[in-house]
Amino acid sequence: MTAAFPLTLSGVHVRKQGKTVLGPVDLTLATDGTTIIVGPNGSGKTTLLRVMHGIERVNDGQVAWECDDPAKHGFVFQTPIMMRRTVAENLAYPLKLLKTPKEQIAMAVDHWLARIGLEASRNGQATRLSGGERQKLAIARALIRKPDVLFLDEPCANLDGHATREIEALLYEVASAGTRLVMATHDMGQARRLANDLVFLLDGKIHELGPAAIFDRPATGALAAFLRGDIVT
């Protein structure tokens, strides 16, 4: 991770109920590509994503964005869509919050429905979508605002192999088009397929970070043990 991205974490700590769940964390993201955050359950992956996005307060340290415009940051949660609304309404919602003109909203919704293959479902309830379709909708809804960086928390959790491959293809396409991706996953195969850079968290601390090559040449015993499966995920 060499070229600077306009997001730097310095001495960040997050404590909950008197317990440190994240920190100390010092991290500057690379300027482009996809950063994958890995680590066992409870290691702080989701908390780190939330801190980066600005929806988790830190107890100590600084989170410095070069650009503080929230429209430039997108987030896909593990339960991200509004189930009682239609597919089209889900897509339109972020743009309505930004008071985007109706004509532009309609064009953007049409574009993303076509891109994720859900044109026929535009007026159907989100509850009728499959798990993979819901996740594609969630990603499209985050991207419809054209963010510079997109944070994703386990975007393929509980999906079958076919749906996972579809989501990975969409994410690869999005990253190739210039959107910066920062993603937490427990799927090491997925991490290998998508990562340009890797962050390994353990007990709320970054134990190793670097280019994807560290998958094959880990510098720490902790990452080597995690990759072997000796640390339960």
Q: Which residues make up each language-model segment?
A:
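Catalytic Walker B motif of ABC-type/P-loop ATPase nucleotide-binding domains
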Residues: L150-D153
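Conserved ABC ATPase signature
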Residues: Q125-L129, E133
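Helix-to-loop junction immediately C-terminal to a conserved catalytic motif
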Residues: H53
